[in-house]
From Swiss-Prot:
The keyword RNA-binding does not apply. The lineage of its organism: Bacteria, Pseudomonadati, Pseudomonadota, Betaproteobacteria, Neisseriales. SUPFAM superfamilies: Ribulose-phoshate binding barrel. This is N-(5'-phosphoribosyl)anthranilate isomerase. Keywords: Amino-acid biosynthesis, Aromatic amino acid biosynthesis, Isomerase, Tryptophan biosynthesis.
């Protein structure tokens, strides 16, 4: 039996974190990119993580952040995995003594094909929609058929996912992990518990 892993990203409150966990999320994402409407600071991140039970992974999302600031956050917030969404290379990403996931903004099949060679130390790759000026969380999707035959490094599907289309996305791509943010929101930075529950329930139905 395969389990479709789910991450709810862009969590901004302890209440939203608790709702995600209650619905069955495997991981929650905290955005430390101040250019995002879903950004959190250290104080808020500590409140969110304090509300989580054991065995739920906390993922910190960074975009072209300095190594100094990343280390400062890691020293104060219990982070299990780092997710890099900017222009970071493998040498930069691997230096923080945490497993890391690298987001790949997909335009063509070559973006997918070359990703594993570019980031050999990544625990996984996250395939997201390309946007010329935004780094994730855009609500846009890419051509899922580009992933239909992919069999490289472990990977996560993101980009424009919703409770309504995640089933189709998994069937087309064969994804075993999915990441959603805007697709389960009531408004920017505020999750809709019903949408979160519906998204995870659909993923769970495919876990068989």
């Amino acid at each position: 039996m395969r389990k479709i892993r789910t991450k709810i990203c862009g969590i901004t409150t302890p209440e939203d974190a608790s709702a995600a966990v209650a619905a069955g999320a495997d991981a929650v994402g905290l955005v430390f990119f101040q250019g995002s409407s879903r950004a959190v600071d250290i104080a808020r991140a500590k409140k969110i993580t304090a509300a989580l039970p054991p065995f739920v992974s906390v993922v910190a999302l960074f975009v072209n952040e300095s190594a100094q600031n990343i280390r400062r956050i890691l020293a104060e917030v219990p982070i299990h995995i780092i997710q890099f969404h900017g222009d970071e290379d493998d040498t930069f990403c691997r230096q923080f003594d945490r497993p890391y996931i690298k987001a790949i903004r997909v335009q063509t099949a070559s973006d997918i094909r070359n990703a594993a060679d570019r980031f050999p130390d990544a625990q996984a790759l996250l395939f997201d929609a390309y946007h010329p000026s935004e780094y994730g969380g855009t609500g846009h999707r890419f051509d899922w058929t580009l992933l239909a035959e992919y069999s490289g490094k472990p990977w996560v599907l993101a980009g424009g996912l919703t409770p309504e289309n995640v089933g189709e996305a998994v069937r087309i791509t064969g994804a075993e992990a999915v990441d959603v943010s805007g697709g389960v929101e009531a408004s920017k930075g505020k999750k809709d518990p019903a949408k979160v529950a519906a998204f995870i329930a659909t993923a769970n139905r495919l876990s068989r």
